[in-house]
């Protein structure tokens, strides 16, 4: 059964059409990624779902208009707010369930920092705290807007792993936007923004050079190198890992 329904969504900004008759259906508990270039409308799309912008069309979550439940839709951005409160103080504003707080802090490796002021946290820890706060609010929908741009691969993997863990445990519905191909690995499905539309795309089609090139998507170095080596017939199509690539080149 569809949980998020978007029908004939259109939006313009200063007479410039950003989206035209977009239709999407997302199931409860799905983690979807929206992949496209910068300045393509990813952030605008999430702001529309959050109910922060006026639009033409219909957006419902759990059969309710977003104007009714927008306070129960969590939008995570790269912007981090710092207060003089400690991590524990921040979380106690959301719930008094100390057992739940303790568990999630341990999962995100923040338990030892519980009495630390949020002003002293790194960007990485601030983002972990924001995700924790979002999860504790038990939202109808979580929107994540390219928050991993300033994180290294280890930090990204840690956060993605925890988000996926709680998505599966709590049946969370998540929409994530990114320009990086490597960031979609935890997704249940992937969409592309192109020509004012948002379209579901298969993994097979996604990894074609044309789609990547047309949408100015940042690809992992492995795939970029693979395409160049294939161009000179140095490796075959079925190479999928670095070790296989090295073996074929050395033959």
Q: Where are the regions that the model predicts?
A:
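Conserved beta-strand-loop-alpha-helix hinge in the C-terminal portion
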Residues: 197-222
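Conserved structural motif at the start of ABC-family nucleotide-binding domains
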Residues: 4, 18-21
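The feature captures the beta-strand-to-loop junction immediately N-terminal to the Walker
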Residues: 35-37
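Conserved ABC transporter NBD signature motif
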Residues: 57-70
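Helix-to-loop junction immediately C-terminal to a conserved catalytic motif
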Residues: 50
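Conserved catalytic motifs of ABC-family nucleotide-binding domains
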Residues: 74, 79-89, 93, 117
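Conserved ABC nucleotide-binding domain
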Residues: 104-121
């Amino acid at each position: 059964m569809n949980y998020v329904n978007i029908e004939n969504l259109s939006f313009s900004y200063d007479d410039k059409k950003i989206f035209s008759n977009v239709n999407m259906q997302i199931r409860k508990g799905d983690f979807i990624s929206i992949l496209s270039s910068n300045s393509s409308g990813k952030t605008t799309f999430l702001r529309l779902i959050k109910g922060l912008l006026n639009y033409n069309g219909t957006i419902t979550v759990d059969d309710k208009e977003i104007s009714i439940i927008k306070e129960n839709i969590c939008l995570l951005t790269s912007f981090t707010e710092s207060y003089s409160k400690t991590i524990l103080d921040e979380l106690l504003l959301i719930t008094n369930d100390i057992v739940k707080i303790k568990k999630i802090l341990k999962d995100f490796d923040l338990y030892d920092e519980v009495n630390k002021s949020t002003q002293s946290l790194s960007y990485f820890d601030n983002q972990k705290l924001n995700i924790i706060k979002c999860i504790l609010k038990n939202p109808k929908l979580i929107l994540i807007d390219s928050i991993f741009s300033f994180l290294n691969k280890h930090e990204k993997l840690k956060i993605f792993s925890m988000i996926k863990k709680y998505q599966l445990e709590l049946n969370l519905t998540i929409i994530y936007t990114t320009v990086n191909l490597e960031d979609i690995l935890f997704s249940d499905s992937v969409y592309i923004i192109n020509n004012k539309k948002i379209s579901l795309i298969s993994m097979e089609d996604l990894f074609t050079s044309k789609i990547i090139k047309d949408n100015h998507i940042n690809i992992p170095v492995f795939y970029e190198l693979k395409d160049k080596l294939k161009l000179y017939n140095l490796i075959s199509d079925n190479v999928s890992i670095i070790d296989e690539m090295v073996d074929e080149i050395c033959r």
